[in-house]
């Protein structure tokens, strides 16, 4: 134990020393956020026509807010282009207009026309609305000159256990964790934009029943807006946000006063009808074709303006985009993100632990097998919102039994899943607890088959730049897992962020019997120190460089006897971000791994390459280049060379994207890995090909084709979406999966065709 404590202490001393030498200017106080009064639309007055033309007389009755400040490239300087934002409330709707003046409208960049597409590569505006004025949570709305709908939810100011190194919102990046920003929430609202001879303009109409809020007169909300002037690579804010943070930092938002907020009745029904045909070419008995016609219903009831009940019957996710293939060269499970809408909405409410490392609740465990095969969900419900000063979430889902292909035998038991989550916000800090339960049900489930996980957590804002978080959790199991499933896990994590430094460190511990079956836990039985440091200075005398971004990260795993299991260093001393976007640099990775048992890194057509148990250490060096992402033709390249266990490793990763028009894009990627080991040589190739065409901002057709030599399969997913409101509409999906290498099975493995129609019925 002394070894890893000593090593971690050295990293922590470096962090404190670096923070101590932060220039005094960095610690300067933020200017107080601006305050403005919302305009009021009389019941007798005509509502603004949402057409992207800010020319109605009603807008002239509202005082515009036009003082915007740069975050980049010159922090604190006035915006180089004028922006006017007006906010109007009336008739149960929040109206927002923006005039984004531009001295040369011909240079406006428009690169996306699909709903929820990234806004970081296009001229755009993103708004955060803190409807509870709690300085932690917000709804996010954004758009670009084509009028796309971009929306999401922010919790805990977008902060989590990762280290944010991007800014601006609407597609900012985060390395090392998952942000508490959920871009998969789809609200019911309207937006229109257009480019004019003075720049571009946009109008938004957001019904109050789309939001959650506290009723009453003369209420105050937090409000901030970021404008991305992409051809200048300039980001400006209504309320000043220092570097290192983004639009999700709602505690720094402006205050929007004078809101009269009525009680609301919010009942939504979302019925669906579906027809599908699936053909399994590998089936040797019975009919290879399964035809299905079914219907289901989602129900949403706003019990109170700040509390919502969702219910689902005969749930279906046929329209969900396919997973992107990954290559696994480790001895641990890969992480695939959730993509199903029902579980994505309000997902941050149920987040607990350290994402992708110690997750107590991972919704992909519900309704999906370990290999990603769907398991029927009979129904369920979710309650989420605020109740008596608490953020609350309750979820219950019942899955069906899984049968064999012929439908003659139950091969998988039914399960009932329950999750309860509570959080109390105190200032910008929060404290909470979670309970997760899986209970086997149905004819084949043992009576004592269950798994439970429960824990408490805290996120403490020590200062404007320092945050401390942590949790303690335990699991218990019955049945065959009873001996394994009772043990503890915990973590403490510290994060310091300002406009030059992002420094963080933490310690995790997971017992050998800790077993959250409804969570995600790639390994157990360890103690883990970790440390990260990012330094992002902006040179003033080198005109073409936006910033340098050297960074360092370290983590290691020890067993409870103090023996090293594995260790990883990422040393990135050289990274340059040019002013026009993109980045390039060189880095080195150092790894140690001491597997106690052999494991396979290649297994194809009976040929296996196995790493023996032992002690290994190796270095790899890499050069990477990412072109300006807003360019019409963009891409990236990374070349890596070095060792891998006791062999040699060479890889090249290439991506290229061509924006044919703002409505049509195509991209191709290629990852090539050449690995030579004493136990055998092998090559991995992963090739994703993507194409998208948007007929309108709500109608598009997309294709994802992938080849993965590790599995030998080529898969195709083609998806036509014609949306009307809040992510509902007509979906047509075609899937095809082929085995290109095996000589023992049919080339075509499976094929499916799905037509699904959903409709939002609002009361």
Located regions from the model:
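Bacterial N-terminal signal peptides
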Residues: 11-24
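Structural preference for beta-rich elements and adjacent junctions enriched in aromatics
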Residues: 27-424, 432
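Outer-membrane beta-barrel proteins
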Residues: 207-215, 247-262, 303-307, 346-350, ...
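Outer-membrane beta-barrel transmembrane domain signature of Gram-negative proteins
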Residues: 240-262, 402-454, 459-462, 584-642, ...
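Surface-exposed extracellular loop regions of Gram-negative outer-membrane beta-barrel proteins
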Residues: 263-310, 417-477, 539-542, 547-551, ...
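Large, well-folded core regions of big proteins
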Residues: 375-381, 387-388, 394-396, 426, ...
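Exposed, low-structure sequence patches enriched in small/polar residues
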Residues: 376, 471-763
